[in-house]
From Swiss-Prot:
Gene Ontology BP, a term: proton motive force-driven plasma membrane ATP synthesis
Classification lineage: Archaea, Methanobacteriati, Methanobacteriota, Methanomada group, Methanococci
Gene3D superfamilies from the UniProt entry: ATP synthase, E subunit, C-terminal, F1F0 ATP synthase subunit B, membrane domain
UniProt-recorded name of the protein: A-type ATP synthase subunit E
This protein's UniProt keywords: ATP synthesis, Cell membrane, Hydrogen ion transport, Ion transport, Membrane, Transport
Family: Belongs to the V-ATPase E subunit family.
Species: Methanococcus aeolicus (strain ATCC BAA-1280 / DSM 17508 / OCM 812 / Nankai-3)
InterPro entries on file: ATP_synth_B-like_membr_sf, ATPase_E_C, ATPase_V1_Esu
GO molecular function, one term: proton-transporting ATP synthase activity, rotational mechanism
């Protein structure tokens, strides 16, 4: 399936991105913990010098607070890293139309979109670059392939080019129904899964 291929490609890119920034995350974590430990030691040393009878209790309290603050910082840093990785994946998504496999993915996205709509005459909306990539003969081939499956006449026509990264938007002729299979929409629909996978790769 076209959308599945895109999701798989996104997760592959996530894996590559994760390996690059995971070491940075570890360095940041070590720095936070070390700073917290030094801060706690300095404060408790001052207390011990003053002969505070409750030094041990105070020391433990400061250390507990330091660990809590460290954990909060780590959680915030983790979220920042996940967001950074996702933004990197969004940038990588813009490069997908340049790949050799893109035309095959695009054709599958068109087929998925057509199959999801109950209509005989449908409009295929592409960006300007893909308007040239997908020739009329390719749409005719899709018509024939799907007609044999659904046992009804299907007419596909190109619509006006859209401002999308890639992929397609399939609409009924009257415009009342549509399936948005643009690359960015496929990405957003799979965001929950992408975030979960990025998190598992990073941590």
């Amino acid at each position: 399936m076209g959308a599945d291929k895109i999701t798989s490609k996104i997760l592959d890119d996530a894996n590559n991105t994760a390996s690059k920034i995971k070491s940075e995350a570890q360095k940041e974590a070590d720095l936070i913990l070390e700073k917290a430990k030094i801060e706690a030691e300095e404060q408790t040393q001052d207390i011990l010098k003053r002969g505070d009878k409750e030094a041990e209790t105070t020391y433990n309290r400061i250390l507990a607070e330091a660990r809590l603050n460290s954990k909060k910082k780590m959680l915030k840093e983790r979220e920042n890293l996940i967001n950074m990785a996702i933004e990197k994946l969004k940038e990588d998504l813009k490069e997908l139309p340049k790949k050799d496999s893109y035309k095959d993915i695009l054709l599958k996205l068109i087929i998925e979109g057509v199959m999801s709509l109950d209509g005989n005459e449908l409009v295929v909306v592409l960006n300007e670059q893909d308007m040239e990539l997908i020739e009329d003969s390719a749409l005719w081939a899709i018509e024939k392939e799907l007609e044999s499956k659904v046992k009804k006449v299907i007419i596909l026509k190109k619509g006006a080019p859209a401002n999308i990264i890639g992929g397609c938007i399939i609409k009924t002729a009257d415009g009342t129904k549509f399936c948005d299979n643009s690359l960015e929409s496929v990405f957003e629909r799979n965001m929950e899964s992408i975030r979960a996978n990025v998190a598992s790769l990073l941590f």
